[in-house]
């Protein structure tokens, strides 16, 4: 994407003197880490854990330093900055995209239709965490400047796209509050769904199981027995317990899954070296070891209130080990650490039977071509209704006890 000069945006029609400067930078290292995190993770200023580990300066820098994003990847960093009176009041992890891979909010049909009509869909702008279908803030604002910064970043992204002749702007897995604010500014609000586990103040895993129907309790207990009887041990590692040898093993698992799902893994081997150096405290790594070697693993990231499940892989098949490593170990960790939610990534109706319930996820979209935008808006209206109906149906099939029904003794 061509360099975009700094420009000003008026963020308050009633007070025209309120000006915010918008700038695009092509490396997160161009922004002081403390200043970025003052917007991305103000709650962590005292050394605590950020709500969202994926928008921190250290995570985005690890993606860049490892060349998981950048030249040749189709994810070209174009971070959006908003300043008022010289103070950085907002940032957004924005990328110029030359494809639609690694986003998990699917617009392939849009791109095909756009190009069949004679348009050029790529490059487009994506405000997102690369390869990460985790929900969270996408317009990262300094406390006390939220409204002005969100408005400036939203308008700034659209202006950057328009100035550079780009087809569209996409803000994926944003918060519902951001989606509502963006829709009020003329962007299109898209609703999709994922499966999340919620912690209803459970004291332990058995307390969680007691909230389920008898049949589902029995199934989960059986799956855990089968998985834990695979002939080895399951390790839950975080912080200083994670060592380079663990990444050597996990890389093999990740490569296998990446090759089968995407053709090529999105993250490079160097990313896991960066994770060892600067991200270990943000990570929960579940590894299964048998006969002295690691045979499977699941990578999770830890937020202040949420555990985010990201990657699973294995070099041996063992019944139910996937469920144990990805879902049940995550629930154990969330309960033990007082986390309110586990996000288990994109798709997967099999998660429902294991206590992960359907929830609405949100994204925002702006398309330069008005005729095409109108067609997409009509499609999104139909899609939102279908998603709402699907969530209602799936919820009715959930594993939890029905109110007013008697449970069968075990």
Question: PLM features: residue spans?
Answer:
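N-acyltransferase acceptor-side catalytic subdomain
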Residues: 1-410
């Amino acid at each position: 994407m061509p360099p975009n000069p700094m420009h000003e945006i008026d963020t308050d029609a009633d007070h025209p003197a309120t000006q915010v400067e918008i700038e695009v930078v092509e490396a997160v290292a161009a922004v002081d880490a403390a200043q970025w995190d003052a917007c991305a993770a103000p709650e962590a200023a005292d050394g605590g854990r950020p709500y969202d580990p994926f928008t921190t300066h250290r995570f985005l820098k690890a993606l860049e330093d490892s060349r998981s994003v950048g030249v040749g990847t189709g994810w070209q960093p174009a971070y959006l900055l908003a300043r008022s009176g010289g103070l950085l009041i907002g940032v957004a992890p924005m990328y110029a995209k030359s494809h639609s891979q690694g986003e998990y909010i699917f617009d392939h049909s849009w791109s095909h239709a756009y190009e069949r009509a004679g348009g050029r869909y790529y490059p487009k702008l994506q405000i997102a965490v690369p390869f990460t279908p985790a929900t969270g803030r996408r317009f990262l604002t300094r406390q006390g400047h939220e409204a002005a910064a969100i408005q400036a970043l939203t308008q700034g992204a659209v202006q950057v796209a328009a100035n550079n002749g780009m087809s569209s702007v996409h803000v994926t897995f944003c918060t519902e509050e951001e989606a509502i604010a963006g829709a009020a500014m003329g962007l299109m609000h898209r609703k999709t769904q994922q499966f999340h586990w919620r912690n209803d103040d459970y004291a332990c895993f058995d307390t969680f199981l007691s909230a389920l129907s008898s049949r589902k309790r029995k199934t989960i207990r059986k799956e855990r027995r089968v998985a834990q009887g695979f002939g080895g041990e399951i390790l839950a590692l975080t912080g200083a317990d994670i060592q380079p040898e663990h990444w050597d093993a996990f890389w093999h698992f990740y490569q296998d899954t990446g090759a089968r799902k995407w053709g090529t893994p999105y993250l490079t081997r160097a990313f896991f070296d960066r994770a060892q150096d600067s991200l270990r405290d943000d990570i929960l790594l579940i590894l299964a070891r048998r006969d002295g070697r690691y045979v499977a693993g699941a990578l999770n990231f830890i937020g202040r209130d949420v555990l985010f499940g990201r990657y699973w892989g294995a070099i041996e098949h063992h019944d139910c080990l996937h469920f144990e490593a990805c879902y049940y170990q995550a629930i154990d960790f969330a309960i033990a650490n007082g986390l309110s939610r586990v996000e288990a990534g994109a798709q997967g109706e099999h998660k429902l039977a294991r206590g992960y319930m359907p929830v609405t996820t949100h994204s925002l979209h702006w398309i330069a071509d008005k005729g095409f935008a109108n067609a997409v808006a009509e499609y999104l209206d139909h899609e939102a209704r279908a998603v709402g109906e699907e969530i209602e149906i799936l919820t009715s099939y959930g594993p939890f006890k029905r109110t007013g029904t008697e449970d069968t003794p075990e």
